[in-house]
Amino acid sequence: MRAGHETETSIMRPQYPGDDIRPTSKKELAGWYSYGWAAEVFTVCAMGSFLPITLEQMARDRGVLFSDKVTPCSATLNGPSRMSIQARWTLSSRYDAGRPTVANQCVVYIFGVEINTASFAMYTFSVSVFIQAILIISMSGAADHGSHRKLLLMAFAVIGSVSTMLFLGVVPKIYMVGAVIAIIANTCFGASFVLLNSFLPLLVRHHPSVLRSAREPRPALDDSRAQEGHSDTTNGIEHGIESNVTSPLLHARQGNGENAEADMHPATHITVSQELKVSTRISSFGIGIGYIGAIILQIVCILVVIATNQTTYSLRLVLFLIGLWWFIFSIPAALWLRSRPGPPLATTHHGKHTRSWIGYMAYSWKSLYRTAVRTRHLKDILLFLAAWLLLSDGIATVSGTAVLFAKTQLNMQPAALGLINVIAMVAGVLGAFSWGSFSRVFNLSASQTIIACILLFELVPLYGLLGFIPAIKSLGFLGLQQPWEMFPLGIVYGLVMGGLSSYCRSFFGELIPPGNEAAFYALYAITDKGSSIFGPTIVGIITDRYGEIRPAFVFLAILIFLPLPLMLLVDVERGKRDALALAAELQPSGAQTYGTLPTNEDRAPPSEL
């Protein structure tokens, strides 16, 4: 086995000082999977279920009724943190005779401004996403260059997990501290996952099977075999639940010029196909194991909430468990994941390395600017990114809005809200596998499948708007008037998410100029992360204006519909032609030979994040 590793290593030579060319080991892969198992629970169990309702409930415990602005929302001799949430909802229901209206809505005053308790949670998420986007851009240079990647990953993991555990000590009296902790935890989670995904191309490139394929004889492929390999890869992506991968999967060897990917071994159809197969397999398994862990912990959290009588303390306790899970299962990643240092930054004109944090941050923002300038010449990428910005904002906003709507207007208890999330996750996994079969049966292209997902997604807010129609409202059900209606909508939401996660990223990859995957996927990730600033903020403003969340469904319906005409304008073939033309313009006159280190004079300015 050792001899085999030596042979595989011998076909690669370090490209820069500190370059780790050891083949990817099973233990290293286990470390990478372990962090997905550890951290995925935060986005699914915390952000998707218990964190929004915890923030809302703590604010509610300190708020007053919207109807009279005087009566406390929670009044008890035993203290609000231990009073049963079900009991509090029963008390509030006396104002609305069992029918959800604005009467049981609560407001708090922050710096003299009246804010609905549901809006409080939405504003908190908007702030966290804004900080997260700034942080992701600023740290990308340090993550991709030098030896900081693993250090940053573990630092964000520790800060994020410990912050989540600190919710155990946050009582309603200091609910603003809870908002600050939520912002820190969500920011650290997003940053850590971007860092985790940046390991993926390195694990793939040094995977033993990829190294073996690079060493094997490379016969010329005819068109039919090349097409067959491409088809296999596409099917793998369609069926692989490949979501949230925000780093390049092919030859992202950065730092030795704009097209540093060419510095690797000569690109062939065999090598590219093998790398795509390996990357799809690793990515899919990582996402799958993360969801399995999240489902397990979500069920545990539901049982804990029920066993502790569904109090505010119950919500804080499950957040502590989520943070503890995140912390404990990050330890194998810290032990087994190799640092895999990246290439050093380009030198300055004075010959001094810009390795300070200020230098890394400046490099990151300049790289983003260069990528944005390039995008101006690619009409179809611009159209798709605009559609994706709106669509990803809609995805994130609908999730948070639905949870808060179910709690504040349908009076659903935390255990039931957690169960909805489990159902949505299971439906998402099924959707990721079923959309591929659906598209083949109806002979749909990738863009047409995305459009079908958008149309199905549009049904969610439209169904909520049915509650405004007097004839339906008089029935007492339909139009989200009863708690049970949330469960089928959760299935629809999960199916849509499964389809979009399987298709959007792979569709975007078809439009990227070859050799520039790193920069454009970074732009894709920033569009994804940063878009969620606006939706929750607007929903919060609408809720504050009308005193309830239901009117926000009008905004959500518009937000989900807007990507539809943009996707209809995207021309894949035109996008591919434009991408190839731009790649030809960016192709340097000479590429650095694999295995050699360029001098300062020979090194082209880096352009990728």
UniProtKB/Swiss-Prot annotation:
The chain crosses the membrane at residues 35-55, 117-137, 151-171, 176-196, 287-307, 317-337, 381-401, 415-435, 450-470, 477-497, 522-542, 552-572. It holds the Pfam family ATG22. Keywords: Amino-acid transport, Autophagy, Glycoprotein, Membrane, Transmembrane, Transmembrane helix, Transport, Vacuole. Residues 214-231 have a biased composition (Basic and acidic residues). Coiled coil: none annotated. It comes from the Eukaryota. Its main location: membrane. It is a multi-pass membrane protein. GO terms for biological process: amino acid transmembrane export from vacuole; autophagy. The keyword Transmembrane helix applies. Residues 214-240 are annotated as: Disordered. One of its GO terms (cellular component) is vacuolar membrane. Glycans are attached at residues 244, 309, 443. InterPro entries: Atg22, Atg22-like, ATG22/LtaA_families, MFS_trans_sf. It is found in: Vacuole membrane. Belongs to the ATG22 family. PANTHER family: AUTOPHAGY-RELATED PROTEIN 22. Vacuolar effluxer which mediate the efflux of amino acids resulting from autophagic degradation. The release of autophagic amino acids allows the maintenance of protein synthesis and viability during nitrogen starvation. This is Autophagy-related protein 22-1. The gene is atg22-1.
